[in-house]
Amino acid sequence: MPVTTDPGYQGPSVHVAASLPKHDVSSSVLIVPVVSASDSDESEDRPGAVVAAAEPFLTAAAVAEIEAGLRALEATGGSDQVHRLVAPSLPVGSVLTVSLGKPRSEWPADTIRRAAGVAARSLGRAEVVITTLAELPGESGASICSAVVEGLMLGSYRFTDFRSRKTAPKDNGLRKITVLANAKDAKKQSAHGATVASAVATARDLVNTPPSHLFPAEFAKCAKTLGESAGLEVEVLDDKALQKAGYGGVIGVGQGSSRTPRLVRLIHQGSRLAKNPKNARKVALVGKGITFDTGGISIKPAASMHHMTSDMAGAAAVIATITLAAQLKLPIDVVATVPMAENMPSGTAQRPGDVLTQYGGITVEVLNTDAEGRLILADAIVRACQDNPDYLIETSTLTGAQTVALGSRIPGVMGSDKFRDRVAKTSQQVGENGWPMPLPDELKDDLKSTVADLANVSGQRFAGMLVAGAFLREFVADGVDWAHIDIAGPAYNTDSPWGYTPKGATGVPTRTMFAMLEDIANHG
């Protein structure tokens, strides 16, 4: 029976088998991991790459056949190399080898996830795959089957919603995955991986959807549909409700657009699933949902402005994370607060020098309308803290300074020292590679305003990410452990695909946040 996933992104079906099929499946591709041969293995009769994890699924004859093909292709076994071979002794159409580099006694889950992603991107028109990747020995605690499924699904992801027949792919993409595995929990792990990958793909879909089709009202509608399908309680505040309740940041940022802002609340009451509901933790999630960011009156340069379709990636990840928590029935309470607005220049847009009253009463002088994300996040943080959470995790494409400091693949993590470090460590474990950043107390002095409680930017050129983090810290309630994940670069890949990461939306940091929820559910 296939492993099924809940409603949402419709990816391939996932199956687990204890052996290769006996009958001919010539339409399928067998993905086999290989490693570089050790010095003692290399000879005229041995290739530079050798098959890993052969037993019990591949016979000695099949291994010899594959390695002969690798030798003919002069494969070296270097990381991320792929080769397509024909192995007549096997009941498959072809064999795709993916190299993991030097041999190891234990493999990190993300190394295997990445190899699976590389293989998936090399499948061509193949719709059915079988793989022995799950038989690689993982590090202690690593969920290898889950990593394999995640890598294959995320690597094969593609977004074609707006392509006509003229440019749409002629094939259906990857439709079926069979993981060869003998582990007792292989089916459970594979199901977990499929559900996680589907959530990440949902986040990617939202980010890749152009702002012509995903504006605040439509984004809120999508969030409501996804939330209700997962069994979440959903509350949507429109512009009139936001104005009445005093969400000055969201209203101020959104007032320049004809498309009015929204704020969505998604609630997972998982504590009732806990063994001891009274001791179950409560987590608040907040994600920035700027559906398009021109910069407003402080307008951005035109050259790369089209990438600002991704300025709602934090919101997409938060929505995907909480629906995933509901689908996998995490025994903790999770509440997501998601502000949504479009930042446009117009005769009604906020001006540099305007003063906003944020939700909760703090006044902010808007010195730069392109520092708008922190304004809507501030409203959402105050509202989220009214629920008295134990932890607050928020994420956004907060600052271009994140890419200056850490590049396009490493999120910056700021917040309460211990919790920040916990989030960063978890991010590194799942392969999203967050890095802890400091928030020096003196940064608050740079946010002084001559007319309001705070200014939304400092007069300094430097430490822009940290200054934004210091601004957000002013809105976090005392006693709440919190972390902000700045994904300005990692949320959207403008370079070539790599690993299981496509060009365009990446889904970062969905897996980090969900892994944190799992960790909190298990360890408090």
UniProtKB/Swiss-Prot annotation:
Presumably involved in the processing and regular turnover of intracellular proteins. Catalyzes the removal of unsubstituted N-terminal amino acids from various peptides. Keywords: Aminopeptidase, Cytoplasm, Hydrolase, Manganese, Metal-binding, Protease. It is an enzyme of class 3 (hydrolase). One of its GO terms (molecular function) is manganese ion binding. Gene3D superfamilies: Leucine Aminopeptidase, subunit E, domain 1, Zn peptidases. This is Probable cytosol aminopeptidase. It comes from the Bacteria. Binds 2 manganese ions per subunit. Belongs to the peptidase M17 family. Mn(2+) 2 binds at residues 288, 293, 311, 372. Its main location: cytoplasm. NCBIfam families: PRK00913.1-2. GO terms for cellular component: cytoplasm. Its EC number is 3.4.11.1, 3.4.11.10. It catalyses: Release of an N-terminal amino acid, Xaa-|-Yaa-, in which Xaa is preferably Leu, but may be other amino acids including Pro although not Arg or Lys, and Yaa may be Pro. Amino acid amides and methyl esters are also readily hydrolyzed, but rates on arylamides are exceedingly low; Release of an N-terminal amino acid, preferentially leucine, but not glutamic or aspartic acids. GO terms for biological process: proteolysis. InterPro entries: Leucine_aapep/pepB (IPR011356), Macro_dom-like (IPR043472), Peptidase_M17_C (IPR000819), Peptidase_M17_leu_NH2_pept (IPR023042), Peptidase_M17_N (IPR008283). The active site is at 300, 374. Mn(2+) 1 binds at residues 293, 370, 372. SUPFAM superfamilies: Macro domain-like, Zn-dependent exopeptidases. PROSITE patterns: CYTOSOL_AP.
